[in-house]
Regions:
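C-terminal solvent-exposed extensions
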Residues: 4-15, 157, 218-301
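Entry/capping segment at the start of metal-dependent catalytic domains
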Residues: 1-66
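Sec-exported extracytoplasmic/periplasmic mature domains
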Residues: 61-64, 79, 95, 107-111, ...
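Solvent-exposed, acidic/flexible segments
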Residues: 23-26, 35-36, 49-53, 67, ...
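Flexible, polar/acidic helix-loop-strand segments at domain edges
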Residues: 28, 124, 128-204, 208-210, ...
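Amphipathic, coiled-coil-like alpha-helical scaffolding segments used for oligomerization/assembly
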Residues: 91-151
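Second-shell loop/turn segments in exported
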Residues: 44-47, 88-96, 111-116, 170-177, ...
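Extracytoplasmic/secreted envelope proteins and their assembly/folding machinery
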Residues: 54-56, 87, 91, 99-107, ...
Length: 301
């Protein structure tokens, strides 16, 4: 496994940790990045200033009671404050300062304390997809993926086909917003497959899956394989409906003063959602405000 030397050590100001009552467990917040580099993201030594930007940014929260998982995507073109660099697209933080600055930027934006960090390029998910025998998606229209013509409807995609599915952008009516949904679809499909194919109930299968993940994903040095296995076992009872995928509410798209195409976040809608994540109250927030956030359907397209 490739480990990233403590990416939290150089962050001057951290978001506060969640307060929990005696005997309770806090939520676990993992910042997951997908890079736009075609080189292996499992080798953190390959990071160089200005060389890579993040193609996907997701906060994955495992609730303290281990009954739900919430995944919140932040559009890569979101215009935010990058500490030490002024306003910029959030995906530039990784280019400017690697894992540490990215964590600092996300915590500064959301107020959510990040416990662990993971980074991969989406080619890394090819191996995970093939490890579990492919992923199921519903194609709205016939598509050619990785050289194979596929009809509309339910299809099982191998790793290369799933990669092509998530990289498509030009034909999508909402551009990057639809691409984010496809990235979420791929992740949901992997998780659903793992939950239903016996991986979590078989120590051998779980170890094999995590070993494949460890070869293709770089994590912070405190996130050991044993910790991953323990967290997976604690959530083995979850069903697909217990895992919610959402995207940070936005106010629209525009152009920055220097001519960049950007996404403007909706501060009024984002603040209570970020607070719910920070306090491990996502389930309650979504119940109380069912129209506040668009959730990816359990049956994904």
């Amino acid at each position: 496994m490739e480990f990233i030397a403590d990416p939290f050590a150089d962050i001057p100001t951290r978001a506060p940790q969640q307060k929990v009552a005696a005997g309770e467990e806090p939520a676990v917040n993992i910042l997951v990045l997908g890079t736009d580099s075609r080189t292996s993201a499992s080798d953190p030594s390959q990071w160089k200033e200005g060389a890579q930007r993040t193609d996907a940014i997701m906060i994955v929260q495992v609730s303290g009671d281990r009954k739900t998982v919430s995944v919140m995507s932040i559009p890569r073109d979101s215009w935010v404050e990058i500490p030490g660099h002024g306003q910029g697209k959030i995906n530039a933080a990784y280019s400017y300062g690697g894992p540490s600055l990215t964590i600092h930027t996300v915590e500064n934006l959301t107020g959510i304390h990040i416990d662990h960090f993971a980074v991969a390029n989406f080619e890394s998910f090819v191996a995970l997809t093939d490890e579990i025998g492919g992923v199921r998606v519903n194609l709205k229209t016939p598509q050619t993926l990785a050289g194979k013509e596929l009809g509309a409807g339910a299809q099982v995609l191998n790793g290369q086909q799933a990669l092509a599915y998530t990289r498509e952008r030009s034909s999508l009516p909402n551009g990057d917003f639809d691409r984010v949904k496809r990235q979420q679809t791929w992740m949901r499909s992997i998780v659903s497959r793992v939950l239903t194919n016996g991986t979590l109930s078989s120590p051998t299968a779980l170890y094999s899956f995590l070993k494949t993940a460890s070869r293709t994903v770089a994590v912070d040095e405190s996130f050991t394989l044993n910790q991953m296995q323990s967290l997976a076992l604690e959530t083995r009872h979850l069903h697909s409906n217990d895992i919610r995928f959402m995207t940070v509410p936005t106010a629209g798209t525009g152009t920055s003063a220097d001519g960049q195409s950007i996404v403007t976040l909706d501060a009024d809608a984002d603040a209570p959602l970020f607070k719910a994540f920070a306090e491990d109250r996502v389930s309650a927030y979504l119940t109380e405000h069912p129209d506040a956030v668009e959730l990816l359907p359990a049956t994904v397209n």
